[in-house]
Amino acid sequence: MQIFVKTLTGKTITLEVEPSDTIENVKGKIQEKEGIPPDQQRLIFAGKQLEDGRTLSDYNIQKESTLHLVLRLRGGMQIFVKTLTGKTITLEVEPSDTIENVKAKIQDKEGIPPDQQRLIFAGKQLEDGRTLSDYNIQKESTLHLVLRLRGGMQIFVKTLTGKTITLEVEPSDTIENVKAKIQDKEGIPPDQQRLIFAGKQLEDGRTLSDYNIQKESTLHLVLRLRGGMQIFVKTLTGKTITLEVEPSDTIENVKAKIQDKEGIPPDQQRLIFAGKQLEDGRTLSDYNIQKESTLHLVLRLRGGMQIFVKTLTGKTITLEVEPSDTIENVKAKIQDKEGIPPDQQRLIFAGKQLEDGRTLSDYNIQKESTLHLVLRLRGGMQIFVKTLTGKTITLEVEPSDTIENVKAKIQDKEGIPPDQQRLIFAGKQLEDGRTLSDYNIQKESTLHLVLRLRGGMQIFVKTLTGKTITLEVEPSDTIENVKAKIQDKEGIPPDQQRLIFAGKQLEDGRTLSDYNIQKESTLHLVLRLRGGMQIFVKTLTGKTITLEVEPSDTIENVKAKIQDKEGIPPDQQRLIFAGKQLEDGRTLSDYNIQKESTLHLVLRLRGGMQIFVKTLTGKTITLEVEPSDTIENVKAKIQDKEGIPPDQQRLIFAGKQLEDGRTLSDYNIQKESTLHLVLRLRGGVLSSPF
C-alpha cells in the first residue's frame, strides 16, 4: 500500500509499504529516498512517536495514512535545571524532547518521580505533552524545578473590605481546605465564600497547584449574598429533593448539597437538565437554570464492569467501563489502547450503530457484552443538497457520515448554522445522530435543505387541571423539543406527556409546522397513567414477545419497544390486531387493545433487492435484502433458508471475504450480485470455492 511522510519543511514523501513493515524498515526506505540516517529520524502518527520494533499494523496505519517526520538534531544541546535548594543539574536534550522526557531524565539523575516535578520556564509551568521547542527553550536555558509537596508556603487572601489574611498552605491543598482555614481565622462558613484568582472563580475540588497558585500569591474573597433560590432535584424513584442554591453555584457544589441531604457521593451522581448532562465545573447560570427549575438525578452504578470490543481483524480488546460511560468515552478508551482516532471508529452492538452522546446503559450493554468495531472506510461518495432557492450543492461524504457531519459540511460551504438546517430525504426529516447508510442514502442521492425560520412564536398548552402554560417555540421545533420545554417549566418527564392538537396525538419526531400548528394555537396535555399492562406480539416465525405497555402508548411507542427487544427497525414493522393494520399515531386504547391481547407482527420487505448466493455444490439461493443489511443479517437469512449456522459461513464477493459488521453497500454489492458461500469445516480445514 502507499503511505505519505510529511517533513517539517512541508515536503511530502510517498512510500510503498506493507502493513507488516516495521518502523525500522520504513526509516530505511526514507533513508533510501532522502538520505536521512534512521537514527536521526523520529516518526509521529496520531500524536504518538513510533517505536522501531513495532509494525505499521500495530499502530493501525492504513493505506494513504500520513506520518510526520521530525529530525533529531545531532549533538543535541545542554540545558540546566535549577532546584529550590540551589543545586543545578545539567541535561543532554533535543529541542524535540517532550517535557515528559525531560522529567524522566531528571528522575534518572536525581530519583525524583515525574509526578512530583513541576518545571517552570519564563515564569510558566511546562505541560508534559509539549516539547522544548514549543516553549522556545534553547541551548543552555535554565529551567526551575519545583517539587509538588510537602513543606508548605504562605498565600494571602484579600477581602472586599481591604483586609488581608495570611494562610499557611501547601500546593496540594484543595480550595475546600483553604476555605476551611479561612473559616478558622475569620468565622465565615465555606458555603458563603467565593475565591477568585487571576479573574477566575476557584472550584472546591481543585488544588492550589491546579491553578498555579504559588507562594505569596493573593486570592480575592467575595461573599455569596444570601437570598439565593430554590431548585428541585427529581430522582429515578420519583422522590423530589429541594435545594437552596445560587446561580453562581457550580454543578460540583450542587452535588455536594445532594450528598449532604441524601448521602449519595458526587462521583455517583449524574445531573440532567433539558436533556443535557451537566458538567462539574460549570455554574447553574451557565445552563440558564432558574428558580424552581427541576434537575433529574441519575445514579452512576459503581464497581464498573468489563466489556469486549472485537475488531474486524478478529482481535478482541478488553475495556474497564461503567454503565454511565458514553460511547464517546468508550471510543477514547479504544484510542488509548489501539491508537485509532475516535472519528474513524464505528461501534456496533446488536446490529445497531452506537451514537457518541448515549451511554452504555442506554443501549442495555451489560458486563462482558461484546461490541464490534468497524473502521470508517475512506474514499466516500458524492451527494447533492438542493435548497429552496433551487441551488444545488455537491458534498463529498461517506456512508458512515452522520447527518450532523453532513450539516457541518453544509455550514463549511454555505455558512448556514446546523441548528437552522433541516434535511429531507424520501419525504422524511433526517435525525442528527443517524448515518447516511441508515437512511439508505447512496452515491448521487439528492437531499433537500429546508431552513428553520428564526423569530419563533408563542403557543399555549392546556392541562387537564385547566392550567395553561405559554411556550416560546419555532415552527421547526419537534414535538420532542416541545415536551422538553414543558419538562423545564412543569417538571413532567416527556415520556409521561401526550400532546393533542385538533383531536390528534402528536408524534415526537414531527415538527409543529408538520401539524400546521401556528402562533397562539392551543395544544392539550394528557398525562400517561402509570400502571401498565402486558400484551403479546406474535411474529410470522411463531415466536411470541411479551411487552410492558400502557393503554396510552402509541403504536409508534410499541414498535420502539419491539425494536429494543428484537432489533427490528420500526419502519420495517406492520402490526395487525383484529385483522386491521395499526397506525403509528394512534394509541392502544384507540384500538381497544387490552391486557394480554395478541398483536401480529408482519415485516415490510423493503423495495429492497435480490441477490444470489452460490454454494460449493453449485446450488444458487435467492435472498431478499437491502443495501443497508449487514453481512451478519445476510448470514442469518442463509441460516433461515439452508440451516447453516452463521459461524460456519464465509461469504466471498469479488475475491474478498466479507466481514460481519459491514453492510452490503459498504462492499458495493448491488441487485442481482452473486456471493459465494464457503463453509468453515470443523477442525480447521477450509473448503474452497475455487
UniProtKB/Swiss-Prot annotation:
Site (Interacts with activating enzyme): R54, R72
Any one GO MF annotation of this record: ubiquitin protein ligase binding
Ranges where the Ubiquitin-like domain occurs: 1-76, 77-152, 153-228, 229-304, 305-380, 381-456, 457-532, 533-608, 609-684
Domain of life the protein comes from: Eukaryota
PTM-bearing positions, type Phosphoserine: S65, S141
Site positions per UniProt: Essential for function: H68
UniProt xrefs under Pfam families: ubiquitin
GO BP field: modification-dependent protein catabolic process; protein ubiquitination
InterPro entries in UniProt: Ubiquitin-like_dom (IPR000626), Ubiquitin-like_domsf (IPR029071), Ubiquitin_CS (IPR019954), Ubiquitin_dom (IPR019956), Ubiquitin_ubiquitin-like (IPR050158)
TM region positions: none
Signal peptide segment: none
Modified residues annotated as ADP-ribosylglycine in this record: G76
Family: Belongs to the ubiquitin family.
Protein's recorded name: Polyubiquitin-C
Chain's gene name: UBC
